[in-house]
Amino acid sequence: MHSTIAYVFVSALALFAALHGSTSARNHTEDNSTEYYDYEEARCACPARHLNNTNGTVLKLLGCHYFCNGTLCTAPDGYPCYNLTAQQVRTLTTYPNTSCAVGVCMKGTCVKNGTMEQCFKTP
């Protein structure tokens, strides 16, 4: 009787393992795979500082690079940005006093799209 119960239990356990796989084997495969895990994206997972505007449109990055946990991160292509001079950046305040060139990030550069808007630091 005991051997029958043991046999049924072991068979059920084997069937479960076959259907669902071993947890340790599955985790091991996922941990070593770079196909599904973007390490660059993980290092750049903190929020980037954006500038506000008076138009009520989406907040935009100042340029296309930002630091996150000691890593220089690049915004993805097509991401909205402001293209400002160093002098404009130094004079930014928390109220709208700067006319900012609007653009989109392309390969790490904020490419102007010909429009301007008042931008300012978020409080």
From Swiss-Prot:
Compartments where found: Secreted
The superkingdom of the source organism is Eukaryota
Q: What is its main location?
A: secreted
Q: Name one Pfam family in it.
A: EVA_Class_A
UniProt keyword annotations, A-Z: Disulfide bond, Glycoprotein, Secreted, Signal
Give the signal peptide as a residue range, or say none if absent.
Answer: 1-25
Carbohydrate attachment sites?
A: 27, 32, 52, 55, 69, 83, 97, 113
Database matches in InterPro entries:
EVA_Class_A (IPR045797)
Give me any GO biological process, just one.
Answer: negative regulation of chemokine activity
Query: What GO cellular component entries does it have?
Result: extracellular region
**SS bond partners:** 46-68, 64-105, 81-110, 100-119
User: TM segments?
Assistant: none
GO terms assigned for molecular function: C-C chemokine binding; chemokine binding
The job of this chain, per UniProt, is described as: Salivary chemokine-binding protein which has chemokine-neutralizing activity and binds to host chemokines CCL1, CCL3, CCL3L1, CCL4, CCL4L1, CCL5, CCL7, CCL8, CCL13, CCL14, CCL15, CCL16, CCL17, CCL18, CCL19, CCL20, CCL21, CCL22, CCL23, CCL24, CCL27, XCL1, CX3CL1, CXCL1, CXCL2, CXCL4, CXCL5, CXCL6, CXCL7, CXCL9, CXCL12 and CXCL14.
Protein name per the record: Evasin P1243
Native source organism of the sequence: Amblyomma americanum (Lone star tick)
